[in-house]
């Protein structure tokens, strides 16, 4: 059920874009994301920080897109989101000497510190890559191509998360043997 909720806004955005254009699609994305968050809250009785940030950015950038009739705002939202995540992970690691991923997931996954550090670096690199690739697509491709990229670009996080799982798995198996 939750996986369907994750895809709801992007599928509705894509469909409405193909039928009605970027401004209707932006309004649909805003409404679908708000509905998605309401449903997640109804199921979990809480929203994670990432959900709140995503909703705030979609509503903010979407409102600017609609009010100013300028699609650049909604197209830059992923660049800002991923860039901010990359910077936040790096600053937490360097300035605060804390591993944000370990703080977030350490109670659920017992992993060696070196594994947490590598995961953190992988997330920093992944978020920086996603920010950069979205910026490239926004700057060099048409809005039609950007929308297609947004839909098919959902493969990137799936591949990344599968890779993370494959990296973590041997370390979890080793825990049971000690």
Swiss-Prot record:
It comes from the Bacteria. InterPro entries: YciB. It is found in: Cell inner membrane. GO terms for cellular component: plasma membrane. The chain crosses the membrane at residues 10-30, 47-67, 76-96, 121-141, 151-171. It is a multi-pass membrane protein. Coiled coil: none annotated. Disulfide bonds: none annotated. Pfam families: IspA (PF04279). Keywords: Cell inner membrane, Cell membrane, Membrane, Transmembrane, Transmembrane helix. Its main location: membrane. Belongs to the YciB family. Plays a role in cell envelope biogenesis, maintenance of cell envelope integrity and membrane homeostasis. HAMAP family: YciB. This is Inner membrane-spanning protein YciB. The lineage of its organism: Bacteria, Pseudomonadati, Pseudomonadota, Betaproteobacteria, Burkholderiales.
